[in-house]
């Protein structure tokens, strides 16, 4: 989907806020801890290349989901280490060596498939992924980890790191978190030779479990100023949201009592009302379940009336406003603010999803 710069809908990305968040988090973790910036999924909707370029001097490396995201960074001139967090296709090994990526190894079957195809592994760098309880990818048994490490090293692979991912670091109860931590520590203790980098701290762990940090952290959601727990846990220190979502009024009219709005005619005015149209819809990631949520116009909350369409929403105004008047969907307007977490709560989801779903049709503007 191509960006649509000739309409007023845009996402404003405060790169300085992201840098400040990295510095804030860095000030609260052990000195010497490596900082890996997670810029997968287009940097959580903020723009991977622009964000990575802005923060490259503040971090020690980057994490992405797949090899295509990694190639995008390299082709944009980013030279710092890039760890691919997901499982890569066998054919990606040659690309990883060519572009100097670090791959994740999550199972013996993957290694054996490479050996069966006689793939040249010499010079490849990898991190071993441990499934300590997340249940997605990773080794579960210490014996498998030892076997994998031996096989890889025998074939010229540099096993640089080992890591895991916590499922409940952003929740009130620490019980499952502690169980995962112990499983991970048990596997580490069983290894004959511990890799150079050991990391288990995602944003939530970095914020609320700083005492469990090994020697690297993966900064994701929090780097963009979002609370990984939503509204469950208070942040231990201030973070600055980096993304503002804005549009403008493109049509304003007064309708009589009884007038209906949107598909299905689900909203009917109970009196004469001022209705405005805003050019954003579910094709932009402003999903259909946002009906009845309020956006901000002139510092006032204005409800979305009628269903969210693919490209447009209709809102009820307290009075007529000129065409071009700013509409804030995420961010501050006057003395009011709408946060990504508030949007997520309304949708019964998480703030990660809210920002990641903002489609490429919305131009990103950086400052």
Swiss-Prot record:
Catalysed reaction equations from the record: L-alanine = D-alanine
Name of the protein in its database record: Alanine racemase
Gene Ontology BP terms: D-alanine biosynthetic process; peptidoglycan biosynthetic process
InterPro entries listed in its UniProt record: Ala_racemase, Ala_racemase/Decarboxylase_C, Ala_racemase_C, Ala_racemase_N, Ala_racemase_pyridoxalP-BS, PLP-binding_barrel
Ligand binding (substrate): 136, 310
Source species of the chain: Streptococcus pneumoniae (strain Hungary19A-6)
SMART domains, per the entry: Ala_racemase_C
Gene: alr
Keyword Isomerase carried by entry: yes
């Amino acid at each position: 989907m191509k960006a649509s710069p000739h309409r007023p809908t845009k996402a404003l990305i405060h790169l300085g806020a992201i840098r400040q968040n990295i510095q804030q988090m860095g000030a609260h973790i052990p000195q010497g801890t490596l900082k890996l910036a997670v810029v997968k999924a287009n940097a959580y909707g903020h723009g991977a290349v622009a964000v990575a370029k802005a923060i490259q001097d503040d971090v020690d490396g980057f994490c992405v989901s797949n090899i295509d995201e990694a190639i995008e960074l390299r082709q944009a001139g980013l030279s710092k280490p890039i760890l691919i967090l997901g499982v890569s296709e066998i054919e990606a090994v040659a690309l990883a060596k060519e572009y100097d990526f670090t791959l994740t190894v999550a199972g013996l079957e993957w290694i054996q498939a490479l050996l069966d195809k006689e793939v040249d592994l010499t010079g490849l760098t990898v991190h071993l992924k441990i499934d300590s309880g997340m249940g997605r990818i990773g080794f579960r048994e210490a014996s498998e980890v030892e076997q994998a490490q031996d096989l890889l090293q025998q074939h010229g692979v540099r096993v640089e790191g080992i890591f895991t991912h916590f499922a409940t670091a952003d929740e009130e109860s620490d019980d499952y978190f502690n169980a995962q931590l112990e499983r991970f520590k048990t596997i580490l203790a069983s290894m004959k030779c511990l890799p150079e980098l050991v990391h288990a701290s995602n944003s939530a762990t970095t914020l609320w479990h700083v005492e469990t940090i090994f020697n690297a952290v993966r900064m994701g959601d929090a780097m963009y100023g979002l609370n990984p727990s939503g509204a469950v846990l208070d942040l231990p220190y201030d973070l600055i949201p980096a993304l503002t979502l804005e549009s403008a009024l493109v049509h304003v009219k007064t309708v009589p009592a009884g007038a209906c709005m949107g598909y299905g005619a689900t909203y009917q005015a109970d009196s004469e009302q001022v209705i405005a149209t805003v050019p954003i819809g579910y094709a932009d990631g402003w999903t259909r379940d946002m009906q009845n949520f309020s956006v901000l116009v002139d510092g006032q909350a204005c409800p979305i009336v009628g269903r969210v369409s693919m490209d447009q929403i209709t809102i009820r105004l307290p009075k007529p406003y000129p065409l071009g008047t700013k509409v804030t969907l995420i961010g501050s307007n006057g003395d009011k603010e709408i946060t990504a977490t508030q949007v997520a709560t309304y949708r019964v989801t998480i703030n990660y999803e809210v920002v990641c779903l903002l489609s490429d049709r919305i131009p990103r503007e950086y400052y």
